[in-house]
Amino acid sequence: MKILIADDSSTVRRLVAARLSADGYQVLEAADGAEAVELARSGRPDLLVLDKVMPKMDGFEVVRALREDPRTASVPIVMLTERTSEQDVLGGLGLGVEEYMPKPFSPLELSLRVRRLLARAAP
């Protein structure tokens, strides 16, 4: 299974990629929102791990773009971000984000959430 990690922090991308690669997933990485949309459309990931605050397009703009595209509309999304106000969480969930996790985060918790979402999405 393929997972796209979109975060402008290379440190966070490396940490998440290391955990998910150790779990056996193929990992794609994007450093900004526009690249995330492009890779989601071309790379066809099974799940996205997405930051909210990124250059070019923020995480909510990415979610909107992906949900409007039939090729990516049903891809599960985990929002992994420092933006955890009630307004941010409700905004993300309202756009169709399946999970909203705060930073700092537990890589093991992220791994379990990813596994659970992928199991639910499997045919």
Annotate the PLM regions.
Residues F105-R115:
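C-terminal output helix
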Residues G24-A31, L39:
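Short hydrophobic/Thr-rich beta-strand motif most characteristic of the beta2 strand and flanking loop
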Residues G43-V49:
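Active-site beta3 strand of CheY-like receiver
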Residues M54:
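Receiver (REC) domain active-site loop signature in two-component systems and cognate sites
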Residues R14-A22:
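Charged docking surfaces used in two-component/phosphorelay signaling
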